[in-house]
């Protein structure tokens, strides 16, 4: 599955809209280990060269969606723990943050097509999430649009401190 194929399936099968949004922004969740020679390059997926207690698959992401639908019944710690058990630590942390900050985040499509008007979040966590999310999936075709968007964030969001 690609992320877009899974999203199409998910729309028709009642997947939580926040999980669909995270899947759209994280195509690397759907990559095959066959396309990733070095397991460190994609810590979200199964890779036979590295033992991982958990990892994301289309099926486990459906389970995460079921949990996301009832997250209002859990505290943050319980919700995150349930995600870790189904999709692995790294993906669970990314998804939990995405769900918490989703209304502040611009879509990748809005950055690619209209970087000067894409939403700029107010929270530092959301700004950092945008930077790291984008760096994981950026392609040369839209790097100029990313740079147009990036200058709209305050320097603290992307500057490295020594």
What are these regions (language model features)?
Residues 1-162:
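C-terminal regulatory/interaction module of P-loop NTP-utilizing enzymes
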